[in-house]
From Swiss-Prot:
InterPro entries to which the protein is assigned, alphabetical: FAD-bd_OxRdtase, FAD/NAD-bd_sf, FAD/NAD-binding_dom, FAD/NAD-linked_Rdtase_dimer_sf, Rubredoxin_C
Reported induction: Up-regulated upon exposure to O(2). Repressed by PerR.
Cofactor binding summary note: Binds 1 FAD per subunit.
Record-given protein name: NADH-rubredoxin oxidoreductase
Enzyme class: oxidoreductase
Length: 379
């Protein structure tokens, strides 16, 4: 039986950040990676499709870095169960590993849906997924992506950049429904249409048989936390594993971070949040006293020259005031509550979006404001 001081389940952004944070504080770290590769930059998977990059091009660190820092990476393995009482993790192979501190950074898994008329359905979550999509796009000659979120739009652009036509189908009226209001979503749809990314809205896939049968069909309809292996434990969970500001779970010496973690009801699934949570978990597993403060989600999309930044909860916001501006190449929306910007989105000007995010982060007050220009002039 193997043993380790810190065992990290997962080698994505949160898992790698946890391992990196523990360097110099713990000399015995083991990472479990379900894939056969060393940790890599998952956000760069589109480059495998668009730019013919290889796994070596997107690795976070080469093998010698792990050897130098005494970090063991066990590949092609994943946890099937945890025994917190005896501090044991059982892997798919049946091997058991004893730990002193456990960090669960198992990430998420792609949501799967049934698509009528599709013989095979793909999703992009791993390097091997990217290779399969790349090959199928060549075979079919075109791609049809179901899902109009950030991943779906970026994937469509990557496939188009590879030389294969791609379109998107969504059941709603406009794309990026979580990041944009209706006006912004329709503005973006029009921009993408003009750039060659066709978006079918209010789609009934049952009636789109010809397109679906002739395309590489890819779903990009969100993810869910990967936590089936904790079901027989007393580790508290709802949508994700419940954690406090030290990334501690309900069980002593077990931490969770990234997509698998739920922090006071929030589970945004963004890489900057995963990185920070992983850092906090890694430090605290080594006996430090680090705290995580909620980061206001601010996903950024850059595709075909269009930049989008969204700050706060646009989707569920109930503002007291809303200010909008639509220009030829720019769209702005600001949602205010109690004279403070609670959420905002900008298409076409990332620097302005960054200023609005700073105003949200600092809870800047905008008293007696009656126009968007007045807000922008006081950022």
């Amino acid at each position: 039986m193997k043993s380790t001081k810190i065992l990290i389940l997962g080698a994505g952004p949160a898992g790698f950040s946890a391992a990196k944070a523990a360097l110099g504080k713990c000399d015995d770290i083991t990472m479990i990676n379900s894939e056969k590769y060393l940790p890599y930059y998952r956000p760069r998977l589109n480059e495998i499709i668009a730019k013919n990059k290889s796994i070596d091009d997107i690795l976070i660190k080469k093998n010698d870095w792990y050897e130098k820092n005494n970090i063991k990476v066990i590949t092609s393995e994943f946890a099937t169960s945890i025994d917190p009482n005896n501090k044991l993790v059982t892997l798919k192979s049946g091997e058991k590993i004893k730990y002193e501190k456990l960090i669960i950074a198992s990430g998420s898994i792609a949501n799967k849906i049934k698509v009528p008329h599709a013989d095979e359905i793909f999703s992009l979550y791993s390097y091997d997924d990217a290779l399969k999509i790349k090959d199928e796009c060549k075979n079919k000659g075109k791609a049809f992506i179901i899902g109009g979120g950030i991943l779906g739009i970026e994937l469509a652009q990557a496939i188009i950049d590879s030389g294969t036509p791609a379109s998107i189908g969504i059941i709603l009226e406009y794309p990026l429904e979580r990041q944009l209001d209706r006006d912004g979503g329709l503005f973006l749809k029009d921009k993408l249409d003009r750039l060659g990314i066709k978006i079918y809205t209010n789609s009934n896939f049952e009636e789109m048989g010809d397109l679906i049968r002739s395309s590489c069909v890819i779903t990009a309809v969100g993810v869910k936390p990967n936590l089936d292996f904790i079901k027989d434990t007393e580790i508290a969970s709802k949508r994700g594993i419940l954690v406090n500001d030290h990334m501690e779970t309900s069980i002593k010496d077990i931490y969770a971070c990234g997509d698998v973690a739920e922090f006071y009801g929030k589970n945004p699934g963004l890489i900057n949040i995963a990185n920070k949570q992983g850092e906090v978990a890694g430090l605290n597993a080594c006996g430090e006293d680090a705290s995580y403060s909620e980061i206001i989600p601010s996903p950024i999309l850059k595709v075909s020259g269009i930049s989008i930044i969204s700050c706060g909860d646009i989707e569920n916001n109930k503002p007291s005031k809303v200010f909008r501006s639509t220009q030829e190449d720019k769209y702005i929306v600001c949602m205010l509550k109690e004279n403070k910007i609670d959420a905002a989105a900008v298409i076409g000007d990332v620097s302005l979006g960054t200023k609005l995010k700073k105003a949200i982060d600092s809870s800047k007050s905008f008293d007696n404001i009656s126009s968007l220009d007045a807000i922008l002039n006081n950022l």
